[in-house]
Amino acid sequence: MRIVLLTGFEPFDQDPVNPSWEAVRQLEGVQLADDVQIIARRLPCAFATAGARLAQLIDELHPEMVIATGLGPGRSDISIERVAINVNDARIPDNLGEQPIDTAVAPDGPAAYFTTLPIKAMVRAVRGAGIAASVSQTAGTFVCNQVFYLLQHALAATAVRSGFIHVPYLPEQVTGSQRPSMALETMVAGLHAAVLAAWQTPVDAKEAGGQVS
């Protein structure tokens, strides 16, 4: 069986749940084709251990595609990331109490890595399912960006395609506030559409997905 590895994060910043994992775990075992299956795994939300855990999973599972996901506070849609940057600049401590500021993700690495996923086709597929989606130009500077960067760094010399998706809060996480959210079933459907499009699309669509600022 060929494997697509899909990851989400454990809860952080005193939240009891992380929607990325709650959504990803629903896709465990889903088949994208007769011989292609999603394997879902959870990553720690910690600079010291997240990348190592992801590397371990890649070594164990030998996936043909890897898509990491995480919570994007303030996001209102399925946000498919374009680029990871070589900087850690944590606004809050991670789950091990570490808060790196202006440090390199990989001192020997380039300034940035682009995703190798067909992000325009993925956005089109999610929107085609009636779910809000967009290409995102920044994955932040917390553990999500670090994992995204380390993922691309690890697979840069391989044929394994990889990238990162941010998801919104769940409605129950933002009760009484004006912050955007997305129902879990909608999130799951959006991720499924995105992952399926990523698997089925060898060459990305040529259409606008940028931002003015």
From Swiss-Prot:
EC number from the UniProt entry: 3.4.19.3
GO BP term (any one): proteolysis
Entry superkingdom: Bacteria
Protein's cellular compartments: Cytoplasm
Record-level Gene Ontology MF annotations: pyroglutamyl-peptidase activity
InterPro entries: Peptidase_C15, Peptidase_C15-like, Peptidase_C15-like_sf, PGP-I_bact-type, PGPEP1_Cys_AS, PGPEP1_Glu_AS
CDD domains, alphabetized: Peptidase_C15 (cd00501)
Catalytic activity: Release of an N-terminal pyroglutamyl group from a polypeptide, the second amino acid generally not being Pro
Keyword set, alphabetical order: Cytoplasm, Hydrolase, Protease, Thiol protease
Entry keyword NADP: no
Active site, renumbered: E81, C144, H166
Listed SUPFAM superfamilies: Pyrrolidone carboxyl peptidase (pyroglutamate aminopeptidase)
GO cellular component: cytosol
PROSITE patterns given in the database record: PYRASE_CYS (PS01334), PYRASE_GLU (PS01333)
Recorded family membership: Belongs to the peptidase C15 family.
Subunit structure: Homotetramer.
Job description of the protein: Removes 5-oxoproline from various penultimate amino acid residues except L-proline.
PANTHER family: PROTEASE FAMILY C15 PYROGLUTAMYL-PEPTIDASE I-RELATED, PYROGLUTAMYL-PEPTIDASE I
Name of the protein in question: Pyrrolidone-carboxylate peptidase
Organism whose genome encodes this protein: Pseudomonas fluorescens (strain SBW25)
